[in-house]
Amino acid sequence: MEREKLWVTRLTWRVSGEHIDKWKGIVKYHMRNRLQDWTYLMHYQCGWAWYTCSRFLIPLGGEGKIVVDCYWHLTPEQGWLSTYAVAISFENWQNTYKTEVTPDVADHMIHCHYFPCFTDRAIQQAIRGESFLWCTYKEGHVAENHWGQVRSLQFLALTVYTDFLRNGRRKRFQGKKTRMVRNLGSQQGAVGRMIKRHGSRTQSGSTTPFWERTPLPSMELLSGRRGKEWGTNDRKGL
């Protein structure tokens, strides 16, 4: 008995085929290194998923997974045989719950599970008062504040330090021993330099990332909402 085709409505972002290919290249590069539990499915592996050219499965621990579907040959009745789009959803492992998610929310979920903001070396640099940096996965911070800015490590350290002064020093030594860091100097040393540099001005931040390193597999880039880095996005939804 032939299976009947079922039509569903999905939230999608219209992009070019070249845009999808570049994003796939980024994902495959990271899948060879740190994202080995991500799964890539070709169109013939997606079963009865009509118009699906490929699919990515991104596990999020025991909660569920993010499913990224890449579509092709959409709206053939209008002659758009080369039209591509992407859709992002979250599903639990029991397949009893599924919901569409926006690229910024998906980036936030992926960031929390796979990409820590700062390495141990970056934290040591901040303690010494050196000027460091930003989280390399900026897209995962869109939900953190109104402007989507990523807080610098110095700003976060200064916030913790001021909270420590406000709440009292005794709490620092309760419960467990504190790891000492060498070369901190006096109170006018590393912390003092950091306060002078960051305490009298507003937090710095930017919605534009630095691309010196290999780009990370951001859903914002895939959906075209940050497509001007590649120049292939028309920013149209279907």
Swiss-Prot record:
> What further fact does the record state?
Vif-defective viruses show catastrophic failure in reverse transcription due to APOBEC-induced mutations that initiate a DNA base repair pathway and compromise the structural integrity of the ssDNA. In the absence of Vif, the virion is morphologically abnormal.
What are the subcellular locations of this protein? Host cytoplasm; Host cell membrane; Virion
Q: Motif HCCH motif located where? A: 111-146
Q: What is its main location?
A: host cell
Write out the ranges of the annotated region (Disordered): 188-214
How does the record describe the protein's post-translational processing? Processed in virion by the viral protease. Highly phosphorylated on serine and threonine residues.
Q: Which gene does this sequence derive from? A: vif
The ranges of region (Multimerization) come to: 159-175
Please explain the role this protein plays, according to its UniProt record: Counteracts the innate antiviral activity of APOBEC3G. Forms a complex with host APOBEC3G thus preventing the entry of this lethally hypermutating enzyme into progeny virions. Functions as an adapter molecule, recruiting APOBEC3G to the ubiquitin-proteasome machinery. Targets APOBEC3G for degradation through the assembly with elongin BC complex, CUL5 and RBX1. Binds viral RNA and affects the stability of viral nucleoprotein core. May play a role in viral morphology.
The record's keywords, sorted A to Z, are: Host cell membrane, Host cytoplasm, Host membrane, Host-virus interaction, Membrane, Phosphoprotein, Ubl conjugation, Ubl conjugation pathway, Virion
Record-given protein name: Virion infectivity factor
The UniProt entry's GO CC annotations, sorted and at most eight, read: host cell cytoplasm; host cell plasma membrane; membrane; virion component
InterPro entries given in the database record: Vif
Q: Subunit structure, per the record?
A: Homomultimer; in vitro and presumably in vivo. Interacts with viral Pr55Gag precursor and host APOBEC3G. The interaction between Vif and APOBEC3G is species-specific, which may play a role in restricting the replication of SIV to their host. Forms an E3 ligase complex by interacting with host CUL5 and elongin BC complex (ELOB and ELOC).
What residues bear Phosphoserine in this entry?
S152
Which family is annotated? Belongs to the primate lentivirus group Vif protein family.
GO biological process per UniProt: viral life cycle
Where are the Phosphothreonine residues found in this chain?
T99
Its induction note reads: Expressed late during infection in a Rev-dependent manner.
